[in-house]
Structures are given as C-alpha cells and as structure tokens.
C-alpha cells in the first residue's frame, strides 16, 4: 500500500524549490542591506550633531562655548559611547594610582584601609564627577559639586600633600582616557567637533576647580581651541608618566583595592579572568608601576577578539541607542528632602534608593546570589536616603565646609558663565 501526501502538502513540496530560489535574492539583500542601514543610522546622529552645533572649520571651533561643549560631550557619554565613557572614567581614576605621590596619600588617609571605605570613596568620586559632567556648567548642581571637590582638596593642597601637577595629571586623564578608549575599542573614531568639545569642557572644568594649565606649552600665551588644549595635555600627561609613574608597593596596594571594587559583582571563580582583563587593559608602563603581571597570550587573544566582535556588532548590527534610553547614573531631580540618588551600583549599594525594582530586580538577584547587600539593607549604612552634594566625601567631612562652599559658589557664578574658556 503506497502512502501519498495530502494535496495541499504535495503542492507545497512542488513549490518549495522555486520558493527557495525566490527568497535567495531577498535574503542576500537583507544580509547586505541591514548592516549598511544600521551603519547609516548610527552615523546619522553624528551628522545631526554637526548641523546642530555648526562649526564648519577648525578656526570656527575656537568659539565653542562651555555650554555647547557640555551638550556635545553629554550626547557622546549618554547615547553614542556610554559603556566606554564609563569604563574609561573608571580606568582614568585607576591609572592615577600608578603615581606614588598619589597612591601614598590615598593609603595614608585610610580611605583604602578596608572595603567599606574604599568602596565609598569610589562611589563618592563617581557621584561628584557625575554631578559635574551630567549637569550644565552653570547649574547649581555643577557649582556645588565643583566647590565641594575644591573644599575636599584644599587642606591637602595647603599642606603640600596634593601636588598641583598631580591635579593637572588627574584632570588630563579624565579628558584623554575617553578619547583613547573610543579610538581603540569603539565602533567609530571621534570627529574634530567631539574632540574640541572634550577639550573645551575639561579645560573649563579645570579652571573652575582651580587647576592651572600654565605648565603646558601654550599655557601662558593661550590656547586657540579645545583640540589644542587636549593635544597638549595628552602629550604632557605622557611625559609626566615617563618621569613619575614608577613601581611602588603603595601603587599595588591602591590598585588592589580599586580592582576589588571593579570585580565585586563577579563570582569569585571568575576573579582570575577579571584580573587578566584588568591587566590586559593596562599598558606596560602602568602594569610595571602597579607591580602587576602581564596577561597570558591566550587571554589577550580572547579579549582582543571579544572587543573586536563588539565593535563589529555595534557598527553593523545594533541600532543606535534611542534618546529615551540615554544612560545616566545620577537622579535628574532631588527627592522631597533635597537629596539625590545614584541610579545604579557597581559594588556596594551606596546612595541607591531602596525601591521595589532595586530590591527585587535583576541586579538585586545577582547581589543575593553572591550574598551581597542590596539597597536598603543594614539600615543607613549605605546611605539609602541619598546624598546632599555639599556633604559628599569621607564621613569625617560630612556637614563640614558649607560656608567655604557658599563662598566658592559666589566666585564660580562670576567666573564660569558657560562661555568659551579660550576667549
């Protein structure tokens, strides 16, 4: 007895070879067209930015204002390259620990003496920088964060424990590290408009923080634009490292505490891989100064492949991030007590509001599985009530410096008006 297919299936079987032939051009067109479409959409935002902030020539960029630079950089940090902006900021701070004068001061203050203090210092630094870079240069929040940072540094500067050159070096890293990371690891390189914005913003912020750029080649005669300042501070920082980034046990001590923060939410079984990646992201000079071993050739190949794959996927397969999903790590508005909160946590949940999502969402489940605290645990230990900007810093500085901050803010409202810092 022979078996036969139902008429409908027989018809489908006869049509199938022809369907494959018909679908082949569509499939090929999709495989070619989709990556080209994604690439075009990704570059569309850069084109729109160039139209919105119209500086057609290098000469015209000399007129870029602090406010314009802030808006351009904010778009880069929140929409174009959020992951690398965050990562480069973390490694900028990490890199400063390769300078013995900096690492010795940190260990003497006791801020790296135990996990709670080192984790809070990391979060406090991130909060202050976030307030400075995510808010308009002429906003109250930016003024307070700049003034608070100046107050926290003032005592150490007066005693000679913080060197002016170390402050300029730290400022330089926060300006040049995003450029280096984006050039090496992102889906496109930066335009002159974006480079000028980074240089203009950080030069202006340095002025507000009282960090002089006079030591740079054009420091006394004047910089023509943000690109020139960025180029000169980049070269100067590399020369500074060549002289002062040398091996020291305190460098290693500071680096180990910082690495503990970066790897905190990684299962301990994966910590060796995390340490390999941390070493991979260092250059030879930094690695030697921190007394770290070079990553193995095998892991270096794996990390290089993963980063290259990420670059390809972002450039050709992943649509651009919509404005509704802009990445911001600080609350846009204060709560009823005029306090602000962090929106995410990397290690211990300092300044995180204990909402239902934060206590029961994916990040909370990861924390629970690793026996780590979640927002709201341990009473007020992790400041679930948030922060007043004027109180950010070590516990012994809480409630102090308010009068000095008010005086500094009066000065800032006169000196930092959002205009071009070069003219």
Swiss-Prot record:
Pathway assignment: Secondary metabolite biosynthesis; terpenoid biosynthesis
The reaction(s) this protein catalyses: 4-farnesyl-3,5-dihydroxy-6-methylphthalide + AH2 + 2 O2 = (4E,8E)-10-(4,6-dihydroxy-7-methyl-3-oxo-1,3-dihydro-2-benzofuran-5-yl)-4,8-dimethyldeca-4,8-dienoate + acetone + A + H2O + H(+)
Membrane-spanning residues: 23-41
Highest taxon in the source lineage: Eukaryota
Cell location: Endoplasmic reticulum membrane
Swiss-Prot/TrEMBL GO biological process terms: mycophenolic acid biosynthetic process; terpenoid biosynthetic process
Entry GO terms, CC: endoplasmic reticulum; endoplasmic reticulum membrane
GO function terms (MF aspect): oxidoreductase activity; polyketide synthase activity
Entries under InterPro entries matching the protein: MPAB
Membrane topology value: Single-pass membrane protein
Entry similarity comment: Belongs to the mpaB oxygenase family.
Name assigned to this protein: ER-bound oxygenase mpaB'
Organism: Penicillium brevicompactum
């Amino acid at each position: 007895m022979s078996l036969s297919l139902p008429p409908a299936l027989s018809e489908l079987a006869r049509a199938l070879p022809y369907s494959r032939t018909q679908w082949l051009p569509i499939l090929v067109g999709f495989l070619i067209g989709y990556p080209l479409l994604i690439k075009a959409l990704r570059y569309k935002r850069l084109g729109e930015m160039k139209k919105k902030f119209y500086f057609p020539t290098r000469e015209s960029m000399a007129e870029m204002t602090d406010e314009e630079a802030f808006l351009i950089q904010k778009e880069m940090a929140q929409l174009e390259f959020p992951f690398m902006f965050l990562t480069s900021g973390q490694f900028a701070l990490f890199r400063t620990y390769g300078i013995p004068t900096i690492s010795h001061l940190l260990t003497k203050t006791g801020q790296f003496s135990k996990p709670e203090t080192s984790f809070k210092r990391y979060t406090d630094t991130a909060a202050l920088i976030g307030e400075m870079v995510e808010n308009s240069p002429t906003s109250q929040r930016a003024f307070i964060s700049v003034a608070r940072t100046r107050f926290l540094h003032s005592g150490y500067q007066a005693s000679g424990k913080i060197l002016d050159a170390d402050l300029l070096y730290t400022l330089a890293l926060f300006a040049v590290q995003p450029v280096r990371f984006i050039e090496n690891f992102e889906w496109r390189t930066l335009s002159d408009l974006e480079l000028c914005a980074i240089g203009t913003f950080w030069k202006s912020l340095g002025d507000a923080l009282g960090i002089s750029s006079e030591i740079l080649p054009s420091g006394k005669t004047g910089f023509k634009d943000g690109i020139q300042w960025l180029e000169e501070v980049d070269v100067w920082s590399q020369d500074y490292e060549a002289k002062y980034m040398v091996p020291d046990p305190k460098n290693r001590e500071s680096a180990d505490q910082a690495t503990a923060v970066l790897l905190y939410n990684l299962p301990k079984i994966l910590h060796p891989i995390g340490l390999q990646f941390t070493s991979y992201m260092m250059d030879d000079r930094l690695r030697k100064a921190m007394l770290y071993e070079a990553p193995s050739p095998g892991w270096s190949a794996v990390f290089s492949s993963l980063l290259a794959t990420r670059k390809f996927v972002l450039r050709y397969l992943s649509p651009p991030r919509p404005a509704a999903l802009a990445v911001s790590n600080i609350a846009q508005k204060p709560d009823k007590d005029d306090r602000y909160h962090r929106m995410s946590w990397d290690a211990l949940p300092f300044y995180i509001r204990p909402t239902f999502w934060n206590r029961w969402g994916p990040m909370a489940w990861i924390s629970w599985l690793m026996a780590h605290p979640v927002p709201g645990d341990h009473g007020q230990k992790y400041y679930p009530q948030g922060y007043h900007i004027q109180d950010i810093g070590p516990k012994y500085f809480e409630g102090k410096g308010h009068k000095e901050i008010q005086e500094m803010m009066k000065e800032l409202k006169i000196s930092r008006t959002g205009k071009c810092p070069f003219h």
